[in-house]
């Protein structure tokens, strides 16, 4: 007669094989990330590394696109099923007649930092000093461009009095600072920590935490998120729920583990030869993440306020914020991450 231990062992193997089989037969889901190595989008790759997609029986491919605007275009073209990018794209797209909704909110704040070049720091001590300056953004029409304009406006400087230059992110942003092509610019970790370490730039506005974001924007600003076309979610409710559960488990993992633990899960090419710098950047960024993937109550209104000020597509339009996100898929109980 079999012992309980033998039965449990056989059952465990059977379950593992069943999960592997389910993933093998699952329809591939492709997710485009607006810059996969950015820490604001950390949950995308971390979910894959932790095996949470496979645990849900999903076959997910993560692709990277430097700018969120381009990732959005891939989604609308049907080339990818989901995007990890800024929540504000869902509002912008609704103004253009496209129904896209965020299923999981990663960041309750932008995680963005306005950095000022050390060369320009003496004459640029706040956003009130950007008149006549060149400000770097990832791309024109990007989330960073709207945030930059809003910060300047709050400081009393209209968008006609400075220049925005699209310089991308990561190494291209660093090059723009070093070459003196921009006086200041908006970027994220780990680029922020790299510039601080080399002494090429200083922090001007810090939106990596709730306090700094409320001071800069007047409220929380949900940013990094996982969004899909509304029609896709309704036609693939099971997959949408499983994806949301996988991401929610990752957010729980982030909330319950140290920066060192998280960094240990990431591929080496995410931190290169400077793991300590990456861990430091992670520590500075951890407060930005939600613990459960749900939309902060005051978030959508703040985002709409920013977009209504500078996005010509949104300005003057009626936006139904309730259609830009849903907590339905992450509301179901999710097992606590223990890996």
Question: Which residues are covered by each model-predicted region?
Answer:
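Short, solvent-exposed loop/beta-turn-alpha elements that line the ligand-binding surface or hinge
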Residues: 126, 209-219, 286-296
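Short, glycine-/small- and polar/acidic-enriched structural segments
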Residues: 28-167, 176-189, 200, 204-205
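N-terminal signal peptide c-region/cleavage motif recognized by signal peptidases
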Residues: 16-21
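Bacterial N-terminal signal peptides that target proteins for export
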Residues: 1-11
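Boundary at the C-terminal end of the N-terminal hydrophobic targeting segment
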Residues: 22-26
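Pocket-lining segment of extracytoplasmic ligand-binding domains
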Residues: 172-267
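Secondary-structure end/capping motifs
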Residues: 233-314
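Conserved C-terminal helix/tail region of periplasmic/extracytoplasmic solute-binding proteins
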Residues: 304-339
